[in-house]
């Protein structure tokens, strides 16, 4: 299960609803693994196993989910970005790579971690895309430990899609609120496309009410 927040660290109703759902599933004997961008260690894990996406090691420069990466915009900085190395030392370091014909970044075998804020700040779209990269790795790491993928609201839909593509497991997306609920008719087109992509690729879509269901059918053609 992919969420964006989990009690006690919540900013709205999404985390509370996710917690209630995990408790309900646990009462029916369903084991839930709940992935969040940032866990703090004080989450109630009596009913759920919480996975902190900020602690997941992912292959450096992994392009297996290239279509998600393409939604990010990168700005090149023409600078010797190697930490803790003086300019003279860097030149010597780089010359060795040029002499041997290797690229300065030999990425094979490297791993990295993404540090998520888990909030709703200025870098939200970037975090949503990076969360999908981590979700793909989570699906690989937990292969054989889950039967179903459940993604809560648009923030996690790319993550759900990535996990489905890696694992082949069915995807359920949970529509708590649409972009039309949040913004009226003046929707954010990026959010709308993420919502539509998530529902299109899902095997099942859960709407929290008949009103929401009708809105999904009317506005998204699902």
Feature names for model-found ranges:
Residues 128-134, 170-172, 180-197:
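Nucleotide-sugar donor phosphate/pyrophosphate-binding loop at the beta->alpha transition
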Residues 148-150, 157, 161-182, 195, ...:
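Active-site proximal beta-strand in glycosyltransferases
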Residues 15-26:
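Short amphipathic alpha-helix
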Residues 200-222:
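A short, active-site helix/loop in glycosyltransferases that binds the activated sugar's phosphate group
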Residues 5-17, 42-43:
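A short, glycine/small-residue-rich beta-strand->loop->alpha-helix junction that serves as a flexible
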Residues 33-139:
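A conserved catalytic-core segment of Leloir-type glycosyltransferases
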Residues 137-143, 188-205:
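Membrane-proximal helix-turn-helix segments that form the acceptor-binding/catalytic region
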């Amino acid at each position: 299960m992919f969420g964006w927040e989990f009690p006690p660290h919540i900013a709205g109703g999404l985390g509370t609803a996710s917690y209630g759902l995990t408790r309900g599933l646990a009462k029916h004997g369903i084991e839930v693994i709940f992935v969040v961008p940032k866990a703090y260690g004080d989450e109630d894990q009596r009913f759920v196993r919480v996975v902190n996406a900020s602690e997941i090691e992912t292959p450096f420069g992994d392009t297996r989910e290239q279509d998600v990466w393409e939604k990010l915009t990168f700005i090149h900085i023409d600078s010797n970005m190697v930490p803790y190395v003086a300019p003279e030392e860097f030149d010597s370091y780089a010359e060795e790579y040029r002499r041997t014909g290797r690229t300065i970044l030999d990425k094979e075998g490297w791993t990295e971690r993404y540090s998520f804020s888990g909030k709703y700040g200025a870098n939200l779209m970037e975090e949503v895309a990076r969360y999908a990269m981590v979700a793909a790795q989570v699906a690989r790491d937990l292969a054989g430990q889950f039967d179903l993928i459940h993604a809560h609201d648009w923030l996690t839909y790319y993550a759900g899609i990535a996990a489905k593509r890696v694992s082949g497991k069915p995807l359920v997306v949970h529509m708590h609120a649409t972009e039309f609920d949040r913004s009226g008719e003046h929707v954010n087109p990026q959010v709308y496309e993420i919502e539509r992509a998530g529902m299109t690729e899902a095997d099942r879509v859960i709407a929290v009410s008949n009103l929401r269901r009708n809105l999904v059918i009317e506005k998204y053609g699902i």
